[in-house]
Swiss-Prot record:
Annotated ranges, domain GAT: 171-298
Species this protein is from: Mus musculus
UniProt-recorded name of the protein: ADP-ribosylation factor-binding protein GGA1
Keywords: Acetylation, Endosome, Golgi apparatus, Membrane, Phosphoprotein, Protein transport, Transport, Ubl conjugation
Start and end residues of each VHS domain: 17-147
Membrane topology type: Peripheral membrane protein
């Protein structure tokens, strides 16, 4: 019985590729040598030793073939091989062939010219391999290189795209251990190496299964979303039959079942921002079509919004005031979380829902926001600003109006109507719209201004109303002039509150701020700026836990340089339960407002405090991965 054939070695392939009996270049053998070099873990160092021996052959044809193999490998084998060629150990073997002190007197001019041509082409194409350039310059100084050779067109090769990493060997520690075990001659080490290889292969198989599962799930979501959207739009035009309604209902139920699947996929997607962005987009589409079905087919309200109320002009509070010119406010007041009144469309609703967290699932959109205390801006690196208004010992600079400029706005009780909340917000924003001269007057000495509702503001946003003009006249001793240039005291954020539901996500990928101990904090950037405040960036801070223990007493604080201002609105909670992949997990979201009127490069310092088990963590760090300030108005 014939013994089983062993796989061909690199040495056998190089012998066949450089055989002196070859009538012409054996490109099949050359390419197979390059392919195996890429596949073998120890391929590059072994290949350079074999090539050095062949290049020093006294037979010119064998040496020329070896140099052709070397040139081909440099063009197709990537950085690992470049690093081996760029070592003095291999370069010295080439220098021996061209130097008269060694083999130069016995080497043909054709071989020496080819070596010098290769060295020069590598200095041009691989400037990062400095040792190659040093070797070539040394040959110049010794007079071996009289002038730079003229390179043929195919000598200056474009660098190949980076080869995809073999994930099995990405773990540096395991790779080093495996290399050490394979070099050992002890049977125990070889058995350990075999076991380690099996473990690494199994890990890679699990990773590939996760990727396949994610791709299939996203594809299924996109197909269901597309079909359900078409059927819902057809239903809204009155062209749907009873059978199509049953199909719509089935598609809707299928979309609902895909929500926890997307969340689990996001939980398994650890640090792959590109894959996470695909999941975000799929969930955004899923949420949009679910809300569209509820509104147009069932006629249900979605987060206080019904199709019947989605009429022109019935937009959210901030959009109602988009026509007003809001100069930087100079007053302070307690931050009051407001609830959205009406949404303009299902697209706005779904976009805001999709921004709430990294995983975008089960984030408690209907949970009541805890009442906030007085917020204060961060005045520098020494002051961390948090949602409860507490800071370090350095007090913030005094604002021009005192705190008693108007009655503090109380958090609306659960039974209050949405219009009352919007009217209160309308009054607040109207006072912000006053010029700085009018805000310098102490309000307690004036007669209270008539309370304008949000609808009044909407109808009069294009031109100042007589009431507003009289208000300016009675409160300002001088006629208002052009608004002055913004100063550090005029871009306060304390009177601005952005409802989470009104935020739309941008196309920028989220930034991971903190990811340790199973606790993850991310920054999501809003697409639209605040009306009249293009210097303000709206960020949603998302906190999610995959830890096996509950996380309590979570506090996120932030600070920026003194030329900027930062404010954190109250978080949606301070505790996260232990992670359970079966049930929908909780998450914490918090709106961060960042004012940067001078458009400086942003560097934010954060402090994160939380308790996990019996241990309290106090983490600090910096974040500078913000969009360029000049693009804040159109992310």
């Amino acid at each position: 019985m014939e013994p089983a054939m062993e796989p061909e070695t690199l040495e056998a392939r190089i012998n066949r590729a450089t055989n002196p009996l070859n009538k012409e270049l054996n490109w099949a053998s050359i390419n197979s040598f390059c392919e195996q070099l890429n596949e073998d873990f120890e391929g590059p160092p072994l290949a350079t030793r074999l090539l050095a021996h062949k290049i020093q052959s006294p037979q010119e044809w064998e040496a020329i073939q070896a140099l052709t193999v070397l040139e081909t490998c440099m063009k197709s084998c990537g950085k690992r091989f470049h690093d081996e060629v760029g070592k003095f150990r291999f370069l010295n073997e080439l220098i021996k062939v061209v130097s008269p002190k060694y083999l130069g007197s016995r080497t043909s001019e054709k071989v020496k010219s080819k070596i010098l041509e290769l060295l020069y082409s590598w200095t041009v194409c691989l400037p990062e391999e400095v040792k190659i350039a040093e070797a070539y310059q040394m040959l110049k100084k010794q007079g071996i290189v009289k002038s730079d050779p003229k390179l043929p067109e195919d000598a200056i090769f474009p660098l190949p795209p980076p080869r995809p990493k073999n994930v099995i060997f990405e773990d540096e520690e395991k790779s080093k251990m495996l290399a050490r075990l394979l070099k050992s001659s002890h049977p125990e080490d070889l058995r350990a190496a075999n076991k380690l290889i099996k473990e690494m292969v199994q890990e890679d198989q699990k990773r590939m299964e996760k990727i396949s599962k994610r791709v299939n799930a996203i594809e299924e979501v996109n197909n269901n979303v597309k079909l359900l959207t078409e059927m819902v739009m057809s239903h809204s035009q009155g062209a749907a039959s009873s059978s199509s309604e049953d199909l719509m209902k089935e598609l809707y139920q299928r979309c609902e079942r895909m929500r926890p699947t997307l969340f689990r996929l996001a939980s398994d997607t650890e640090d792959n921002d590109e894959a996470l962005a695909e999941i975000l987009q799929a969930n955004d589409n899923l949420t949009q079509v679910i809300n569209l079905y509820k509104q147009l087919v069932r006629g249900e309200e979605v987060n206080g919004d019904a199709t019947a109320s989605s009429i022109p002009g019935s937009t959210s509070a901030l959009l109602d005031l988009s026509g007003l010119d809001l100069p930087p406010p100079g007053t302070t007041q307690p931050a009051t979380p407001t609830r959205p009144g009406n949404q303009s469309s299902p697209e706005q609703l779904s976009a805001s829902v999709s921004l709430l967290d990294d995983e975008l699932m089960s984030l408690g959109l209907s949970d009541p926001t805890p009442p906030s205390g007085t917020s204060s801006d961060s005045v520098g690196w020494d002051n961390f600003q948090s949602s409860d208004g507490t800071e370090s010992s350095v007090p913030p600079p005094a604002q021009a109006p005192s705190m008693d400029c108007r009655p503090p706005a109380q958090a609306p009780p659960p039974t209050s109507s949405g219009l009352d909340d919007l009217d209160l917000l309308g009054k607040t924003l109207m006072q912000q719209a006053l010029p700085p001269e009018a805000q310098q007057v102490r309000w307690e000495k004036q007669q209270p201004a008539p309370r304008l509702t949000l609808r009044d503001l909407q109808s009069k946003s294009s031109s100042p109303s007589p009431g507003a003009a009289s208000l300016l006249h009675t409160t300002s001793p001088e006629p208002p002039g052009p608004p002055p240039q913004a100063t550090p005291t005029e871009f306060s954020l304390t009177s601005i509150t952005v409802p989470l539901e009104s935020i739309k996500p941008s196309s920028i990928l989220p930034v991971t701020v903190y990811d340790q101990h199973g606790f993850r904090v991310l920054f999501h950037f809003a697409r639209d700026p605040l009306p009249g405040r293009s210097d303000v960036l709206v960020v949603v801070v998302s906190m999610l836990s995959t830890a096996p223990q509950p996380i309590r007493n979570i506090v996120f604080q932030s600070a920026v340089p003194k030329v900027m201002k930062v404010r954190l609105q109250p978080p949606s909670g301070t505790e996260l339960p232990a992670f359970n992949p079966i049930v929908h997990p909780s998450a914490i979201t918090q709106v961060l407002l960042l004012a940067n009127p001078q458009k400086e490069k942003v560097r934010l310092r954060y402090k994160l405090i939380f308790t996990m088990g019996d241990q309290t963590y106090n983490e600090m760090g910096d974040v500078d991965q913000f969009p360029p300030p000049e693009t804040w108005g159109s992310l």
